[in-house]
From Swiss-Prot:
It is an enzyme of class 2 (transferase). The active site is at residue 472. The gene is ppk. This is Polyphosphate kinase. The keyword Nucleotide-binding applies.
Length: 727
């Protein structure tokens, strides 16, 4: 039976379609209604609880039959992956506050121990629900398409023979069982690794009879093993590694009786404790921290739901965890390893229809990309439009004899990065290449260290950003000599220089040679690479200096327009809203009559729809095929509309503790284009969720005679080139 979380309705309730009108504020409430002050904790949603709500929306997609079946499975696995990181970072951070007696309530008023209690309650419900969806919905549906995960009770004699041989040849030689006794203490287990606790009976060759053993499963072993068709029958048949180990645990303890074998998985604190202000060599210090991350403090224990209480209690004691941190699951404890089967070539009908990102006509046949950009700005929206022009710009720069220098920020670039390849080529071809690499990009630290070493070996100058501030800005600057003068070309984006993400995330890219904007980009690079006072910018807003103030000023300007009785409208789209100062500014704007439409994919600590405070604010979240990642800010500005694109969300960490960029969209054509694309998010009635005043999200559905509208499908149709039956 599928359980419904307490903060979600049993069935998605239809929400009336929103019509985009710049001048339709909700009337102010009656003066008799008590209006809370803007510091009142009831006006704010706890950050971590809001993040959990986002993950619940992701899980809901696994039940949506409008998605192809393997994509629904993928959403369920993304839920697991997100939850892993949530415990590794967010839960670990709350526990750390408690352990160091540094409990401090946020704007919402919740103390860390109170938040942890609510998190535990909600996650227990959602994890049980997740496995129910897997076992009762997705696996039976997959079996109809001849994709099977064969449990032990359904093994045929032929399959048992094949499994025994596979276990003997491929698994047993690699596994190292550890018996527990005074000379064999409980092993130090790697974060998120698959392990088994085994209860034994009997005495071994040395007379030992401790009764317990641990089997760590090496990460090099696949978690799902495909069975040959001649053994398992037609279709794609799989056996879990855990099932193989359960079935043959006796073989690992010769002469002893296995009373029980149960899988478990430990999640540890994975946040790096490195303080960049207290180290002399950041790269060297980071390498040491990366190893210790695998063995941080325990924050969660997952065990098979068949595991007896005395064994789960034993494990909890070993890891100094409480019972509220124990999660019993009906299936594999490491679901993220199932990602390997979601791209089956044999079942394209169970996956999204492939598409080819478009290349604008201006660039499609251009021999010289610099000549195109010199005439006009080029705006790309990924993944509907290709990331290739960004790579091509850098490739041409690497080979162009007129290019003098290239400067580039890198936060996440992925393996086998074409961007990094082009930077290496540029350096080898004698260009002055400077790369500002953020070594502390979470979970990409090791990759970025390797990237830095490769660029240094090619002759590039590598800078590790600014001490105390992560460099999250996405910018490239190319200096080229033209007719005796140095001309600047720049790329600014809302997303990373990561070709893989550019096929999965929605992001904007701006290619420009605008004198003022490229000069600003050059100034920001100078600040990052050298030292000196903050430089005055002409067009660019940049954190941690002018971006937050600039956003607050623009919100205040709309507020003033509303107070003067003029139309006032803000549309903002980004990933997360947690900054209390920004939220208060939005509340004040709403109270003054500004119509505010927010499209916030993830965390949102603002409560919309509260009479007298946020009655003019609507918050939507779009969850669909592509991960929404664009940061777009629209201001009506008394009819002189302004739109900014940014690398930053409205979060304290982005606005106060990171190097970020925010740049204007200029020219009537581009301005109208981005506005139209932004408005599409306000009328989506298939993938939109609307935030309620009580913190719930309600899914939008077409009502009456409305046609289904998906903003992602519309953009895909309008901007890209669909390719059928091609992978």
């Amino acid at each position: 039976m599928l359980q419904t979380p307490p903060d979600l309705p049993p069935v998605a309730e239809p929400v009336a379609e929103q019509v985009v009108e710049a001048v339709a504020p909700v009337p102010a409430p009656s003066p008799t209604i008590a209006v809370p002050g803007l510091d009142d904790s009831s006006l704010y949603i706890h950050r971590e609880l809001s993040q959990l709500q986002f993950n619940i929306r992701v899980l809901e997609q696994a039940l949506d039959e409008n998605y192809p079946l393997l994509e629904r499975l993928k959403f369920l696995l993304i839920f697991s992956s997100n939850l892993d990181e949530f415990f590794e970072i967010r839960v670990a951070g709350l526990k750390k506050q408690i352990n160091f007696a540094r409990e401090q309530a946020g704007a919402d008023g919740l103390q860390p121990h109170q938040a942890l209690a609510r998190i535990s309650e909600l996650v227990h419900i959602e994890v049980e629900r997740q496995y129910a969806i897997l076992n009762d919905v997705l696996l039976p549906e997959l079996e109809k398409h001849q994709i099977r995960f064969i449990r032990r009770r359904y093994w045929t004699p032929k399959l048992k023979t094949w499994v025994r041989r596979y276990f003997r040849d491929e698994i047993a030689p690699i596994i190292t069982p550890i018996g527990l006794d005074p000379t064999h203490p409980f092993p130090l287990l790697v974060n998120k690794s698959l392990n088994f606790i085994v209860e034994l009976e009997g005495v071994d060759a040395f007379g030992r009879d401790s009764g317990l053993a641990i089997i760590p499963a090496p990460r090099l072993l696949p978690r799902v093993i495909r069975v040959p068709e001649e053994v398992g029958g037609p279709g794609a048949n799989y056996v879990f590694l855990s099932s193989m180990i359960h079935a043959h645990a006796d073989d690992l303890f010769q002469g002893m009786k296995v009373k029980g074998c149960y899988q478990f998985r430990l999640t540890r604190n994975a946040d790096l404790a490195l303080d960049s202000e207290e180290v002399d060599d950041l790269a060297r210090a980071l390498r040491g921290e990366l190893f210790s991350r695998r063995y941080g403090d325990a924050v969660r224990l997952e065990v098979a739901d068949t595991c007896p209480k005395h064994l789960s209690d034993y494990l909890l004691k070993q890891f100094s965890l409480s019972e509220s941190e124990l999660y019993q699951v009906n299936g594999p404890v490491n679901l993220t390893r199932l990602f390997s089967i979601t791209g089956l070539d044999s079942h394209p009908e169970l996956q999204y229809t492939p598409f080819t990102p478009a290349i604008p006509k201006l660039l499609a046949n251009a021999d010289n990309i610099f000549s195109v950009i010199s005439k006009q700005d080029i705006l790309l929206m990924h993944p509907f439009e290709s990331f290739t022009p960004v790579v091509d710009l850098l490739r041409q720069a690497a080979k162009d004899p007129h290019v003098l220098a290239v400067r580039q920020t890198l936060y996440r670039s992925g393996a086998n990065s074409e961007i990094v390849d082009a930077l290496v080529d540029a350096a080898r071809n004698g260009k002055e290449v400077t790369a500002v690499i953020e070594l502390r990009a979470r979970f990409d630290e090791e990759s970025n260290l390797q990237m830095a070493s490769r660029l240094q070996a090619a002759g590039a100058v590598v800078i590790y950003g600014v001490v105390g501030f992560k460099t999250h800005a996405k910018m490239m600057l190319i200096l080229r000599r033209e007719q005796g003068e140095i001309v600047r070309y720049a790329h600014l984006g809302t997303g990373n220089y990561h070709a893989g993400n550019a096929r999965l995330y929605t992001d904007y890219s701006l290619l420009t040679s605008d004198d003022a904007l490229t000069e600003d980009v050059g100034k920001l690079f100078s600040q990052l690479i050298g030292m000196g006072k903050t430089l005055r910018m002409k067009k660019l807003l940049h954190a941690p200096f002018t971006l937050k103030k600039g956003m607050l000023d623009m919100i205040a300007r709309e507020t003033q327009f509303a107070l003067e009785g003029k139309p006032a409208h803000i549309i903002a789209k980004f990933n997360s809203l947690t900054d209390a100062k920004v939220i208060k500014a939005l509340y004040k704007a709403s109270q003054s009559g500004v119509k505010i439409d927010l499209v916030v994919r993830g965390m949102c600590c603002l409560r919309p729809g509260i009479p007298g405070v946020s009655h003019n604010i609507q918050v939507r979240s779009i969850i669909g095929r592509f991960l929404e990642h664009t940061r777009v800010f629209y201001f009506l500005n008394g009819g002189e509309e302004q739109i900014y694109l940014s690398s930053a969300d409205w979060m304290e960490r982005n606005l106060d503790k990171r190097v970020e960029t925010c740049f204007p969209v200029e020219g009537k054509k581009l301005l109208l284009r981005v506005k139209k694309e932004l408005e599409g998010y306000l009328t989506d009635n298939t993938h939109a969720w609307t935030l309620q005043p009580d913190g719930r999200y309600v899914r939008s559905t077409p009502t009456g005679n409305q046609n289904p509208r998906s903003v992602q499908a519309t953009l895909l149709e309008r901007l890209s080139n669909p390719v059928l039956n091609v992978r």
